[in-house]
């Protein structure tokens, strides 16, 4: 979690709506995946992914594809960075803060698969570990509906 007194505890509604719209509607690949944000805070985000047959990677066991897990965790790390960047630049307009997304990109991503993903839906979370002036880092989790940890990720993101 980011340790700084400069960040507000909450984000403004306009920014949260803009980030949600970006994540769920404007990033086409996220539409394909089907993730829906459930919480956007300055230091973390949460989302839900309903299981669908087109996300299956192992047909015999009905497991979610590892690439889906990886893509979802990467997207969560990126949107967590957006929340932190939005909080850091709280004095800017929503439009100015959203333009910062254009500079955001994944530098490094590591995924650890811990258990097979067989469920009706999955819960995802990401927390910002550090937000520097050029690079940020995040830790992400992919859990089953029962709360069991199925995969973890860490990511580094260019933020400027």
Where are these regions (language model features)?
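Terminal targeting signals and extreme-terminal segments of soluble enzymes
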Residues: 1-160
């Amino acid at each position: 979690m980011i340790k700084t007194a400069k960040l507000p505890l909450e984000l403004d509604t306009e920014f949260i709506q803009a980030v949600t719209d970006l994540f769920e509607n404007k990033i086409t690949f996220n539409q394909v995946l089907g993730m829906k944000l459930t919480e956007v805070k300055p230091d973390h985000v949460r989302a839900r992914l309903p299981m669908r047959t087109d996300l299956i990677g192992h047909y015999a066991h009905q497991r979610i594809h590892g690439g889906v897990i990886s893509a979802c965790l990467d997207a969560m790390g990126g949107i967590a960075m957006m929340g932190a960047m939005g909080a850091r630049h709280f004095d800017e307009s929503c439009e100015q803060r959203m333009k910062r997304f254009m500079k955001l990109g994944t530098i490094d991503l590591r995924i650890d698969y811990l258990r097979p993903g067989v469920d009706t839906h999955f819960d995802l979370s990401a927390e910002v570990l550090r937000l520097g002036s050029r690079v940020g880092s995040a830790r992400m989790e992919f859990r089953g509906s029962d709360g069991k940890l199925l995969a973890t990720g860490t990511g580094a993101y260019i933020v400027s």
